[in-house]
C-alpha cells in the first residue's frame, strides 16, 4: 500500500476491539461456527484500502483461516474449505463468490452486528445464538434472493 495509514482514533480502536472480542470471525459465523480468535481485515478495492481517513471503519473480523489460510491441526485445505468456506488468500473473487462482496455485503452485515451489540451487549467471547441467527438471516437477505439452496437457521 502506498502512503501512510492514518492513526486509529478512539472510536476506530473501539470498533476493532468489539469485533475481535465480541463478534468473532464473520464468515465463520455465517457458516454456522462461533469463532473467537479473530484478526481485523481492512477492506480493499483494487488493492487500496477504502474509506480514506475513515478506513478503520471499513473493517471486518476474520479468523486465521479466512484471513491467512492457516489450517487447523490435522485438517486438510479441502476439509477446511468444505467446513468453513474458502479463505481470502485463495483469491478475492472466490471468497466473495461464497460470502458476498466485502463493500456491499460483508461490511454492512458487520455494521448490523455491531448495531446489535450496541443495542444489547453480550460478554466477551460469548456470542448469543439468537444474535448469530439474526446476523445470518440478515446476510442471507442481503446476499441473494431466496432459493431452494438457501437454508435459514
Q: Where on the chain are the PLM-derived regions?
A:
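Short cysteine-rich loop/turn motifs with clustered Cys
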Residues: 9-41
Amino acid at each position: 500500500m502506498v502512503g501512510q495509514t492514518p492513526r486509529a482514533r478512539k472510536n476506530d480502536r473501539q470498533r476493532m476491539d468489539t469485533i475481535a472480542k465480541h463478534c468473532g470471525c464473520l464468515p465463520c459465523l455465517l457458516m454456522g461456527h462461533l469463532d473467537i480468535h479473530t484478526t481485523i481485515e481492512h477492506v480493499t478495492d483494487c488493492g487500496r484500502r477504502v474509506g480514506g481517513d475513515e478506513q478503520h471503519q471499513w473493517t471486518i473480523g476474520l479468523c486465521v483461516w479466512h484471513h491467512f489460510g492457516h489450517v487447523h491441526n490435522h485438517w486438510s485445505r479441502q476439509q477446511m474449505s468444505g467446513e468453513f468456506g474458502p479463505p481470502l488468500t485463495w483469491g478475492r473473487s472466490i471468497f466473495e463468490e461464497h460470502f458476498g462482496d466485502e463493500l456491499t455485503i460483508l461490511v454492512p452485515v458487520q455494521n448490523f452486528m455491531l448495531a446489535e451489540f450496541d443495542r444489547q451487549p453480550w460478554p466477551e467471547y460469548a456470542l448469543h445464538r439468537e444474535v448469530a441467527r439474526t446476523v445470518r438471516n440478515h446476510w442471507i437477505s442481503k446476499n441473494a434472493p431466496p432459493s431452494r439452496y438457501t437454508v435459514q437457521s
